[in-house]
Amino acid sequence: MNPANYLILSGLLFTIGATGVLVRRNAIVVFMSIELMLNAVNLTLVTFSRIHGTLEGQIMAFFVMVVAAAEVVVGLAIILAIFRTRRSASVDDVNLLKY
């Protein structure tokens, strides 16, 4: 398959993720949109790695996945703390945690 198709798909996935981050107010949906954007970046890294015939892009994609796994743990803990205190998963309630 043509590598340009993978890059177009990656751009489309990143755009969908960015739209989800900017438009939605639910913390879980925003969190999933960020993960979608990270996976789009991974697809781009692997595509360029395949084009150039090197492993650097695949190694960087692996490290992005490791960081994303750590982000999942921390992000879900924060979302759970917000939900327990406010009974809502809205992004607007994040500012209220400091009171």
Curated annotation (Swiss-Prot):
Enzyme class: translocase
Membrane topology value: Multi-pass membrane protein
Keywords carried by this UniProt record: Cell membrane, Membrane, NAD, Quinone, Translocase, Transmembrane, Transmembrane helix, Transport
Compartments, as annotated in UniProt: Cell membrane
Reaction(s) catalysed by this chain's protein: a quinone + NADH + 5 H(+)(in) = a quinol + NAD(+) + 4 H(+)(out)
One GO biological process term: ATP synthesis coupled electron transport
Transmembrane stretches, start-end: 3-23, 28-48, 62-82
EC number: 7.1.1.-
Recorded GO MF terms: NADH:ubiquinone reductase (non-electrogenic) activity; quinone binding
A single cellular component GO annotation: NADH dehydrogenase complex
Lineage top rank: taxon: Bacteria
Quaternary structure and partners: NDH-1 is composed of 14 different subunits. Subunits NuoA, H, J, K, L, M, N constitute the membrane sector of the complex.
Family: Belongs to the complex I subunit 4L family.
Function: NDH-1 shuttles electrons from NADH, via FMN and iron-sulfur (Fe-S) centers, to quinones in the respiratory chain. The immediate electron acceptor for the enzyme in this species is believed to be a menaquinone. Couples the redox reaction to proton translocation (for every two electrons transferred, four hydrogen ions are translocated across the cytoplasmic membrane), and thus conserves the redox energy in a proton gradient.
Cited HAMAP family: NDH1_NuoK
UniProt protein name: NADH-quinone oxidoreductase subunit K
Organism, scientific name: Parafrankia sp. (strain EAN1pec)
